[in-house]
């Protein structure tokens, strides 16, 4: 893989950029302090802005590593982060990345997450040269699965009691897209966009 690190990506409505420590108040206010956002995630709700600040200190310190990918999701009309998306696992030999994301509830059901996900997937395939992009979700959080399907990812199955999140031991539904499948996947994405399906998180 040709690692590029976290470079700025622009879409129609979004700027995906590196976090700065100055983003801590927005991170805390817009999503990290909301238990509804973290319900099916693996990290606890932030109890103070200081926790958000410490997380961002850690992330910003890792940006010098070209294998570290963590973007702030910034709507152009707002100008501050409303969520995050990044690579939570990568495998050099298999040439794959696993993507995780979260976004504040005020921005659910507007297609923001899928727009960010599609942009990061394109970046991983075109710039980094991965062969496989994958992600997973708790089946009790079906809107996350809709994000993956909207981006053309294929459902590969649900592994029973194979994962853990803030609800405890849970099932995990897996989705993935291979480089060789992208053309057909883009046809699916175009169809969904034509039909204006935006019922994701």
Regions found by a protein language model. Give the residues of each.
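Acyl-donor (CoA/ACP) binding surface of acyl/acetyltransferases
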Residues: 1-26, 30-36, 70-201
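A generic secondary-structure signal
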Residues: 58-62, 123
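Conserved GNAT-fold acetyl-CoA-binding loop/helix
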Residues: 38-58, 69
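Hydrophobic residues in alpha-helical segments
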Residues: 31, 41, 63-64
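Short loop/turn motifs at secondary-structure junctions and domain boundaries
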Residues: 61-67, 153
């Amino acid at each position: 893989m040709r690692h590029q690190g976290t470079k700025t990506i622009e879409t129609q409505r979004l700027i995906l950029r590196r976090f700065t420590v100055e983003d801590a108040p927005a991170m805390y206010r817009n999503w990290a302090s909301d238990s509804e956002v973290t319900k099916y995630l693996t990290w606890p709700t932030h109890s103070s802005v200081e926790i958000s600040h410490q997380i961002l200190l850690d992330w910003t310190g890792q940006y010098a590593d070209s294998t570290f990918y963590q973007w702030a999701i910034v709507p152009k009309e707002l100008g501050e982060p409303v969520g995050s998306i990044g690579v939570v696992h990568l495998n050099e030999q298999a040439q794959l990345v696993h993507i995780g994301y979260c976004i504040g509830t005020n921005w659910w059901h507007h297609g923001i997450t899928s727009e960010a996900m599609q942009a990061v997937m394109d970046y991983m395939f075109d710039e980094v040269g991965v062969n496989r992009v994958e992600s997973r979700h708790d089946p009790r959080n079906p809107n996350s699965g809709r994000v993956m399907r909207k981006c053309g990812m294929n459902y590969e199955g649900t592994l029973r009691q194979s994962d853990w999140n803030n609800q405890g031991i849970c099932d995990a539904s897996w989705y993935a897209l291979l480089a060789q499948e992208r053309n057909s996947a883009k046809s699916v994405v175009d169809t969904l966009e034509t039909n204006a399906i935006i019922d994701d998180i």
